[in-house]
Design a protein with these regions (language model features):
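DPxDG-like acidic metal-binding loop motif
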Residues: 1
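Metal-dependent amide/peptide-bond hydrolase catalytic core
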Residues: 98-277
Length: 277
């Protein structure tokens, strides 16, 4: 207890840790803020950090914008069911869904050529479900995916272009296609300039030449519901690089692992950033 009291007396700032639920479904930050996570007293700064395994030992901070705009989409393709022995009486939703997937792939290829200033972007599908049985023409297919873009105007243009493509597929296949966005977009956020300068000094001190200051060209097409915190106060997003040599498994891969030797260095860096505020 005495040691804890001594540390509290010597620590130069008041610190609050946020353990956020529901981050992966984009709801955590909203719920935390509704519960007063940055109030009483009001937070003067917000720090967040991730670990990544695409590079070995290091620390990375983005200059300015630090995330992308993203949203999940759901595409419903409605056809008409019939027996395959009477195929002329049905409308194949699976065939139309295949056209949708092809259109999304083509959009990724063509959009950048038509919009050279679009920046990084991607449209993708993660799941597809449809059909009842082998001898039945499917009357409904659902595709779930996402739109991601560095620039908000690019995100909006991609959404509109995809909608136009879906309307064309409707005409060609006789299906009805509806695209929905079950939730609001996750907007991009930017690192505070002063906090970024602090991170540069600390990063070089702790990690030496393994500290990386990244620009928009290196921006990852990821988003985070933490943008809501950045709207409330100045913030800094830091990535600690902890890849294991020879085991470069990407995010959300079942074999994703971190080199835990990064942990004391990341704690030291965070401590020095906090005590500099």
């Amino acid at each position: 207890m005495a040691e804890e009291q001594r540390m509290q007396e010597n620590f130069p700032v008041r610190l609050r840790f946020l353990f956020e639920p529901a981050e992966e479904i984009g709801e955590g930050a909203k719920r935390m803020l509704q519960a007063g996570a940055l109030e009483n007293p009001k937070a003067d700064a917000f720090l967040m950090f991730h670990y990544a395994a695409d590079m070995t030992f290091g620390m990375a901070v983005h200059q300015g914008q630090a995330s992308s705009m993203i949203n999940s989409m759901q595409i419903h393709v409605h056809g008409k069911s019939s027996h395959w022995c009477e195929a002329d009486k049905g409308i194949d939703a699976i065939y139309a869904a295949a056209q949708v997937i092809s259109a999304i792939h083509d959009l990724n290829e063509s959009f950048g050529k038509q919009h050279p200033d679009a920046g990084k972007y991607i449209v993708g599908t993660g799941t597809i479900h449809g059909g009842e049985y082998t001898n039945i023409i499917a009357d409904h297919v659902v595709l779930n995916g996402n739109i991601r873009a560095v620039h908000e105007e690019t995100y909006t243009a991609l959404e509109h272009e995809l909608e136009r493509n879906l309307q064309e597929i409707e005409k060609q296949t006789g299906t009805q296609i509806r695209m929905e966005f079950p939730k609001d977009p996750v907007y991009a956020f930017a690192n505070d300039e002063e906090l970024t300068e602090t991170a540069k000094v600390v990063g070089a001190e702790v990690f030496g030449d393994k500290f990386v200051l990244e620009g928009e060209d290196e921006l990852f097409l990821s988003g985070d519901n933490a943008y809501r915190y950045f709207r409330e106060t100045r913030g800094l997003f830091t990535v600690f690089l902890a890849g294991i040599p020879g085991e470069n498994h990407p995010l959300h891969h079942p074999k994703f692992q971190l080199d835990e030797r990064i942990l004391p260095y990341s704690v030291e860096a965070l401590y020095k950033i906090i005590t500099t505020l």
